[in-house]
């Protein structure tokens, strides 16, 4: 046989998965009673004797024979006392007959094949089955269940161990001697404890089915329906006595094994032990096991199939036992449960032997078809198997299966899934106690409430070990050949039996009473002497515990208090406590905050972190009305549910949706009254008053009678707390009732234009029943409502009326009081979405509401508290795809057959009010695509074309002339030509310049090659539009640099420097040099102002004002009036054909100092000197200030100063020189102060300075010379010269042939008598006066004068430093400054003498005139230049070698001009922006003839000898124009009433679209009024057949105000809905008129009407149908009828 674990090694525990039942101790066939016990060693043999209460010996006969036969009057509750010696200890048994073991009508019957063999009804059964306690003076005693019918046989507890006792088979009782008995400890089953085997196979039978308890719950409900008088459950857990009326069946193998009549005694002994286990206090309930019927099967029953297959055996037995059960609980033989004892080796789900010991239905007690169990006989431990299976019938599950009572260590319990190797007493665990208590409190054990009708027969009981010695116990367990194994272990701990050659144990101790020594036996696992049995101790209740913590923090939780039956604990067969065991009360009644999950949901969520079949789930509760107090949950998004707990936490509502307060308490649904007491039965009256009588109930009713309405209309308000609500239509109508909350957008019923089905709906905390029969609607609810509910009517047709009423609670005495009105602002419903697809807008208006009256005028509410109307976006279903077509572009041609207009066509979907999304074209394939091109302007004929002739010859042979040609309209199309497209008929032609003979002047004496009148009259000769070159951004904005300056006009922005024609400038300059050698009579005066006009001498203009008289400033400079640009601006170049400004890199800044800096050697950073803004006086070409005169109003403004003509070494000096006898040209010169010395000739006035806020310009006077010079750090000082021209002369001078005499210049600051002038302030242009009043050289010099030169570096206090007092002028003039770097511009240049002889020469001696000396002239040198301004030189010397000897007046000309043609070339400006960015345009640029030296403008004929003039026009923008891209129109800003749509307009490539064809970006939309047609429901057909008409109401309604429009034309933008339609078109079936039985009016009256001929009237014919109908031919007359009746 399979082995078991080694001794004292615990068997592994299995996690229970079974619900029906498990095995405890499998047995093996054992010997029959009376067999030999040889081979058994270490048996504790005891010799019990019967004693009295004091311990005195009474008899060796353990149960008196006389008592069995005669003394039937002996008290059944008389105790029996026994003593025995067990392991040297004296044990005393105090036993009492088990009065509840056998029912008064107990029947023991034997069944044979074919029927009942015999039945024995015992009216007075021997009371030899005893219950009580064993005591030891030192050891702790315990319960004892002993049968004393034939010796002592049973079980008892000692020292927390179980012991069996039974008589010793080998030593039968002898008269006068004590009968030997065997005592041994309870052991684990042999097959689980076979020596040397460590495995413990499972002994569980049937797997758990979670729906078993649900089935039981449903069965209980059906039983309650069948038995309505069943009392309801009580609020408290009450301990009540229960009697389990039991049928015990022993199968044929049992009877054969134990034999007759011992088998009956054996079975009763087992059941007596079972009854003792159910009397253990650990079970927590008083339960009596009572046998009403014992059936012994000698043969197999035909309908009872007992096999190894436990499941089939249980099924067969349950069916069989039900068939033999007596109907009616009052029958003496009716049993509550049935127990089968069999010697078959059971196996769950298989028909072969295995380890299963028993099987039972879980929670099957009191169910006739399920209250049954089967148990495998294993000897006396069979009692524990029976108790285990009965525990399953009471709904107890295995310890550790779904609970936390898994056995720990060696402490087993009765409901443990397996037995452990331990002899400790088996008791009920805490979980078993809770299971059986809940089973009974549920009312599932009602069949156990009836006790047996008669007294129970007393019969004696002795410990089983007295009746069955150890050898007998081995034979009972292992068969007839088994014997006790000696010296293996303490028999009171473990019973070891020999099976073949091996000792086996079932880990059970020998039963109590088993002999273990001299006068000792096993008791409760110890070998003790037989002791005295104490008095029975009934149990007593302890005090109530403190109330537990509330099971919930809100929402009505539960607290409990309990007491235990521990003061004292029942002992020695004492009675268990009866009465209230646990009480409950409610707590934390306040409602939980809104939004919290339900209490069941919280309990389900506790399992979210636990794996279920290897996965984590989010559990949500499942409603289970059958078992409302079980926790059933399902994973979210799954479709299966699982019972996660047998019972929910106390305080969980039984039902989630029902309006019930019932709570689950201790796994049972308890009723909660309105007073919040459990099972109080308190009820509310009809208005919700608990224990009320209805006196405070007030019924409110009303009728809504408005006949017409639009959409949802408020009917009335049901307040919170309303009950008995009834709402119904007065008559049938096609309208619909609706319910909404105070939130206008929250509807409970029929909201959102959606009609719901009939049924129950949760509304405001209660249930409304919605019923619609035909067109008649009503709503009912018991209430109460937890919030106000608005009744609304959805109009479809005229309203016949809506009646509503409800009941509300009002305090008594308050009926006559009118509550004050309460006004408040509320939001109305949201309007319909402004769009039917995509995203739109909804609005919610605010209205004033009175609590009772409903909506009222806004004047009643507080205007300051009025909330703003709300607006929100609304989203409808996506808009369908559609084609969008843009606007037609401008026609490609304004006339002719080729005109074509295009537009963009896109597939789009409207997303929102102002948003569209583009789709692929296939999305719009279901719609026809709009055309993208259309012909245009093809009906318009094009204008005629222009025809042109050939150009004529130029009108001049040189210079500029004109050319002409004929231009005619061809009239080829019949339409006049377009004047705007007419070609030019006259153009300007330019030929080479007209040249004058060299050395001669023009007709007017001008050296320019043309007359001054010609120059003056050519308005386009010098471009007036040229502006000064802008200064860099880092420089301050320059001041004005105009030529015409007026005093006291500092605000005027005067034009900057402009350019003059270098040709005239250069020629005049050369004439000036000719004046140096020719006398006044030889060379005429030249105009040095740079105007190009010859100015008459002062004496020839008598009208000119005196030079000494000031002229007031009366008007701005003439230059600005003539179109010359004013102050510099960032864009001073207007487009003009043939003209272009100098390139930006060549533009001259407006800062005056820049014009004086060297161009070639000056670094780029020169403009960053930070020069201040100032006004620069108009300076003529020769350096003179030239005020504007009437004659010079059209003078060309001066551009660059003449210093820029100098070579680099001399460009830092500007010398303006004029002779003393010359007058400055112009007018308006101010009166100058007189000379400081009276010996000097008077000064000539120079001109006026430009007035500024701080006059920073001083005036200089010299001996006949006035010079303007800016003096600034790094600037240039003035140079005074009378005889030597300093402008452009250095480039004309050849190296000197003869040394010049040395001349010295003394600084004026060191000379006495120098006048002082105001010192310029910081930041201004410093002008230094150099006056050489007494330092003029003798006039006999050759024309070299003194040129005092100021310092370039400022001295202290801002005054310029001076040079040394005496500096040779000639060496300074003919020397080259050494510029080492641009940084040296602030220092005085180091001069390098060109002629050392000149530097060394001293002052000249007095002149000694040599007679006959004459001038000698050398050969002319080559021209200094090939073009432009040049000169030739020749040496001139006096024949005597001393120039002083020759007359200066006769000196030949040493230099003269050459090559008068300027170096000219065409200069092209930048191309202008194309006139059209696409489609063919033109670009222009300015082409000018300029001097190649400094790009000064020249007249065009200067460039004609050179290359041809570059083109000034060119085509551009030839690429074709692209179409403008336009997005889809955005949603209209208004749904109606006129809005605006916008769209994006852009060019795919910037600049490649025709701007003139740019589409509009906005357009008006939704111009129709805000109205729509509103239709009502169709009315009833006017006729059910034969052609009828249905009509409906059609109105034009303003969607903004909701009011109908008087003028239906306002809805003209929508199609008129049909207001009628045909119906009932099927043909009517012919209907026979109803048969007239009798007249409705009296017979006499009808006869009178008939006689009067009124039967022709339909009403009369209907009322008197019998009288008015013609008599039938076959009908007897009334007279005949009367005769017949007679």
UniProtKB/Swiss-Prot annotation:
Glycosylation-annotated residues: 94, 693, 778
Subcellular location: Secreted, Extracellular space, Extracellular matrix
Enzyme Commission identifier(s): 3.4.24.-
Cross-referenced CDD domains: ZnMc_ADAMTS_like
Domain Disintegrin: 462-537
GO molecular function: metal ion binding; metalloendopeptidase activity; metallopeptidase activity
One GO term describing the cellular component: cell surface
Originating species: Homo sapiens
Protein name per its UniProtKB record: A disintegrin and metalloproteinase with thrombospondin motifs 7
Biased composition (Polar residues): 1182-1205
Domain observations: The spacer domain and the TSP type-1 domains are important for a tight interaction with the extracellular matrix. The conserved cysteine present in the cysteine-switch motif binds the catalytic zinc ion, thus inhibiting the enzyme. The dissociation of the cysteine from the zinc ion upon the activation-peptide release activates the enzyme.
Biased composition (Low complexity): 1360-1375
Domain spans labelled TSP type-1: 538-593, 821-880, 881-940, 942-995, 1411-1459, 1462-1522, 1523-1567, 1569-1629
Post-translational modification (record): N-glycosylated. Can be O-fucosylated by POFUT2 on a serine or a threonine residue found within the consensus sequence C1-X(2)-(S/T)-C2-G of the TSP type-1 repeat domains where C1 and C2 are the first and second cysteine residue of the repeat, respectively. Fucosylated repeats can then be further glycosylated by the addition of a beta-1,3-glucose residue by the glucosyltransferase, B3GALTL. Fucosylation mediates the efficient secretion of ADAMTS family members. Can also be C-glycosylated with one or two mannose molecules on tryptophan residues within the consensus sequence W-X-X-W of the TPRs. O-glycosylated proteoglycan; contains chondroitin sulfate.
Signal peptide, first to last residue: 1-27
Sequence motif: Cysteine switch, positions: 202-209
Entry annotated with the keyword Zinc: yes
Residue ranges of the region described as Disordered: 1024-1043, 1080-1257, 1344-1396, 1666-1686
Note on how the cofactor is bound: Binds 1 zinc ion per subunit.
């Amino acid at each position: 046989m399979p082995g078991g674990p080694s001794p004292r090694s615990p068997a592994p525990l299995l996690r229970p998965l079974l619900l029906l039942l498990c095995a405890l101790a499998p047995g093996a066939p054992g010997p029959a009673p009376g067999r030999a016990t040889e081979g058994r060693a270490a048996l504790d043999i005891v010799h019990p004797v019967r004693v009295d209460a004091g311990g005195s010996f009474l008899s060796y006969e353990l149960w008196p024979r006389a008592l069995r036969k005669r003394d039937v009057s002996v008290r059944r509750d008389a105790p029996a006392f026994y003593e025995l010696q067990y392991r040297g200890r004296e044990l005393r048994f105090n036993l009492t007959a088990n009065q509840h073991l056998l029912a008064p009508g107990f029947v023991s019957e034997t069944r044979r094949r074919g029927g009942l063999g015999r039945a024995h009804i015992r009216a007075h059964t021997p009371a030899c089955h005893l219950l009580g306690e064993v005591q030891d003076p030192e050891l702790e005693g315990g319960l004892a269940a002993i049968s004393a019918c034939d010796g002592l046989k049973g079980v008892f507890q000692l020292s927390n161990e179980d012991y069996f006792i039974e008589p010793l088979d080998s030593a039968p009782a002898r008269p006068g001697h004590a009968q030997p008995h065997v005592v041994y400890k309870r052991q684990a089953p042999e097959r689980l404890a076979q020596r040397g085997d460590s495995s413990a196979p499972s002994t569980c039978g049937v797997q758990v089915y979670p729906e078993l308890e649900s089935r039981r719950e449903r069965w209980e409900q059906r039983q309650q329906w069948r038995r309505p008088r069943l009392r309801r459950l009580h609020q408290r857990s009450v301990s009540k006595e229960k009697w389990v009326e039991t049928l015990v069946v022993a199968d044929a193998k049992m009877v054969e094994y134990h034999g007759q009549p011992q088998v009956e005694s054996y079975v009763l002994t087992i059941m007596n032990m079972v009854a003792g286990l159910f009397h253990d206090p650990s079970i927590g309930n008083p339960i009596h096991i009572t046998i009403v019927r014992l059936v012994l099967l000698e043969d197999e029953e035909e309908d009872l199939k007992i096999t190894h297959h436990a499941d089939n055996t249980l099924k067969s037995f349950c069916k069989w036992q039900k068939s033999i059960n007596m109907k009616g609980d009052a029958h003496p033989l009716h049993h509550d449960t049935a127990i089968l004892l069999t010697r078959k080796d059971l196996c769950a789900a298989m028909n072969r032997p295995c380890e299963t010991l028993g099987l039972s239905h879980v929670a099957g007690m009191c169910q006739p078809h399920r209250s049954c169990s089967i148990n495998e006989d294993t000897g006396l431990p069979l009692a524990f198997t029976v108790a285990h299976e009965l525990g399953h019938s009471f709904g107890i599950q295995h310890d550790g299966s779904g609970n936390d009572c898994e056995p720990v260590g060696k402490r087993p319990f009765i409901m443990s899934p397996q037995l452990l190797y331990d002899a400790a007493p088996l008791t009920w665990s805490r979980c078993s106690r809770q299971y059986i208590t809940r089973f009974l409190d549920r009312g599932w054990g009602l069949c156990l409430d009836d006790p047996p009708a008669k007294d129970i027969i007393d019969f004696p009981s002795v410990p089983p070990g007295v009746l069955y010695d150890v050898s007998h116990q081995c034979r009972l367990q292992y068969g007839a050949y088994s014997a006790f194994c000696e010296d293996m272990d303490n028999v009171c701990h473990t019973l070891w039996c020999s099976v073949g050659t091996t000792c086996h144990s079932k880990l059970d101790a020998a039963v109590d009473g088993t002999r273990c020594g001299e006068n000792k036996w096993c008791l409760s696992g110890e070998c003790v002497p037989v002791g005295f049995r104490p008095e029975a101790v009934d149990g007593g209740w302890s005090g109530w515990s403190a109330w537990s913590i509330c099971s919930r923090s809100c929402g009505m939780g539960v607290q409990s208090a309990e007491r235990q039956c521990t003061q004292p604990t029942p002992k020695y067969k004492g009675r268990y406590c009866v009465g209230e065991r646990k009480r409950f009360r409610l707590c934390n009644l306040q409602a939980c905050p809104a939004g919290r999950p339900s209490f069941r949901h919280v309990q389900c969520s506790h399992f979210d972190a636990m794996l279920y079949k290897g996965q984590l789930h989010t559990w949500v509760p499942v409603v289970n009305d059958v078992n409302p107090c079980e926790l059933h949950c399902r994973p979210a998004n799954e479709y299966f549910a699982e019972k996660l707990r047998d019972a929910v936490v106390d305080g969980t509502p039984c039902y989630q949706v029902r309006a019930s307060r019932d709570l689950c308490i201790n796994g049972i649904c308890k009723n909660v009254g309105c007073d919040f007491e459990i099972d109080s039965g308190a009820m509310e009256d009809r208005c919700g008053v608990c224990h009320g009588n209805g006196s405070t109930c007030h019924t409110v009713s009303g009728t809504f009678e408005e006949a017409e309405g639009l959409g949802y209309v408020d009917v009335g308000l049901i307040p919170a707390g309303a009950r008995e609500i009834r709402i119904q239509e007065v008559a049938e109508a096609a309208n619909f009732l609706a319910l909404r909350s105070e939130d206008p957008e929250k509807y409970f019923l029929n909201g959102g234009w959606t009609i719901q089905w009939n049924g129950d709906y949760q509304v405001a905390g209660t249930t409304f029943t919605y019923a619609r029969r035909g067109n008649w609607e009503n709503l009912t609810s018991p209430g109460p409502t937890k919030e106000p509910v608005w009744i609304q009517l959805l109009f479809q047709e005229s309203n016949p009326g809506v009646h509503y009423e409800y009941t509300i609670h009002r305090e008594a005495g308050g009926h006559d009081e009118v509550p004050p009105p309460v006004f408040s602002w509320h939001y109305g419903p949201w309007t319909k979405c402004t769009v039917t697809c995509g995203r739109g807008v909804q609005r919610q208006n605010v209205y004033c509401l009175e609590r009772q009256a409903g909506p009222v005028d806004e004047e009643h509410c507080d205007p300051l508290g009025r909330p703003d109307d709300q607006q929100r976006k609304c989203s409808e279903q996506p808009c369908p795809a559609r084609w969008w077509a843009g606007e037609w572009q401008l026609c490609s041609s304004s006339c002719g057959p080729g005109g074509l207009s295009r537009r963009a066509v896109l597939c789009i979907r409207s997303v929102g009010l102002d948003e569209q999304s583009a789709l692929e074209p296939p999305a719009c394939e279901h719609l026809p695509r709009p055309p993208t091109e259309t012909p245009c302007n093809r009906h318009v004929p094009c204008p005629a074309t222009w025809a042109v002739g050939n150009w004529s010859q130029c009108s001049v042979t040189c210079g500029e002339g004109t050319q002409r040609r004929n231009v005619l309209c061809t009239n080829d199309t019949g339409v006049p030509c377009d004047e705007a497209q007419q070609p030019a008929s006259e153009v300007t032609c330019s030929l080479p310049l007209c040249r004058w003979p060299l050395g001669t002047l023009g007709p007017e004496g001008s050296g320019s090659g043309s007359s001054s009148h010609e120059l003056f009259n050519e308005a386009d000769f010098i471009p007036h539009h040229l502006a000064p070159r802008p200064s860099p951004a880092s420089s301050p904005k320059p001041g004005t640099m105009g030529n015409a300056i007026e005093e006291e006009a500092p605000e005027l922005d005067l034009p900057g420097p402009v350019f003059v024609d270098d040709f005239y400038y250069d020629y005049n300059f050369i004439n000036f040099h000719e004046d140096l050698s020719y006398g006044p009579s030889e060379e005429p005066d030249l105009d040095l102002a740079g105007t190009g006009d010859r100015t008459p001498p002062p004496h020839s203009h008598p009208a000119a004002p005196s030079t000494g008289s000031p002229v007031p400033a009366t008007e701005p400079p003439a230059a600005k009036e003539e179109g010359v640009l004013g102050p510099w601006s960032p864009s001073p170049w207007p487009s003009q054909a043939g003209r272009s400004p100098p390139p930006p890199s060549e533009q001259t800044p407006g800062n005056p100092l820049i014009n004086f800096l060297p161009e070639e050697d000056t670094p780029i950073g020169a403009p960053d000197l930070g020069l201040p803004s100032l006004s620069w006086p108009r300076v003529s070409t020769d350096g003179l200030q030239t005020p504007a005169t009437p004659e010079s109003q059209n003078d060309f403004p001066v551009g660059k100063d003449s210093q820029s003509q100098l070579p680099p070494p001399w460009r830092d000096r500007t010398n303006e020189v004029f002779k003393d006898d010359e007058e400055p040209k112009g007018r308006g010169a101010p009166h100058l102060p007189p000379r400081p010395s009276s010996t000097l000739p008077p000064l000539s006035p120079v001109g006026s300075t430009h007035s500024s806020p701080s006059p920073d310009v001083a005036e200089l006077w010299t001996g006949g010379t006035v010079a303007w010079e800016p003096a600034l750090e790094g600037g240039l000082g003035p140079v005074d010269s009378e005889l030597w021209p300093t402008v452009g002369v250095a480039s004309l001078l050849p190296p000197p042939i003869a040394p010049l005499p040395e001349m010295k210049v003394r600084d004026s600051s060191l000379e006495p008598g120098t006048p002082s002038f105001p010192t310029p302030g910081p930041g201004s242009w410093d002008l230094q006066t150099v006056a050489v009043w007494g330092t003029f050289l003798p006039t006999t010099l050759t024309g070299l004068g003194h040129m005092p030169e100021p310092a370039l570096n400022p001295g202290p206090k801002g005054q310029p430093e001076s040079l040394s007092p005496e500096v040779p002028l000639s060496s300074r003039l003919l020397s080259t400054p050494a510029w080492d770097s641009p940084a040296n511009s602030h220092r005085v240049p180091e001069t390098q003498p060109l002629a050392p002889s000149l530097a060394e020469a001293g002052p000249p001696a007095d002149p000694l005139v040599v007679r006959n000396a004459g001038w000698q002239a050398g050969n002319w040198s080559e021209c200094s230049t090939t073009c432009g301004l040049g000169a030739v030189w020749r040496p001139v010397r006096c024949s005597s070698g001393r120039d002083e000897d020759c007359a200066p007046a006769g000196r030949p000309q040493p230099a003269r001009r050459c090559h008068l043609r300027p170096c000219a070339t065409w200069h092209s400006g930048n191309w202008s922006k194309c006139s059209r960015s696409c489609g063919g345009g033109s670009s222009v640029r300015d082409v000018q003839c300029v001097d190649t030296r400094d790009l000064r403008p020249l007249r065009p004929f200067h460039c004609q000898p050179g290359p041809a003039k570059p083109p000034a026009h060119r085509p551009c923008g030839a690429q074709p124009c692209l179409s403008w891209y336009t997005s889809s129109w955005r949603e209209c800003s208004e749904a109606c009433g006129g809005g605006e749509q916008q769209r994006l307009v852009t060019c795919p490539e910037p600049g490649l679209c025709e701007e003139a064809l740019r589409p509009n970006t906005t357009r008006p939309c939704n111009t129709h009024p805000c109205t729509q047609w509103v239709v009502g429901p169709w009315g009833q057909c006017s006729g059910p057949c034969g052609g009828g008409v249905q009509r409906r109401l059609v109105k034009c309604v303003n969607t903004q105000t909701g009011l109908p429009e008087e003028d239906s034309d306002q809805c003209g933008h929508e199609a008129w809905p049909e207001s009628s339609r045909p119906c009932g078109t099927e043909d009517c079936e012919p209907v026979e008129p109803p048969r007239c039985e009798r007249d409705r009016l009296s017979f006499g009256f009808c006869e009178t009407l008939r006689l009067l001929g009124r039967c022709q009237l339909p009403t009369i014919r209907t009322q008197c149908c019998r009288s008015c109908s013609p008599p039938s031919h076959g009908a007897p007359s009334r007279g005949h009828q009367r005769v017949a009746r007679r």
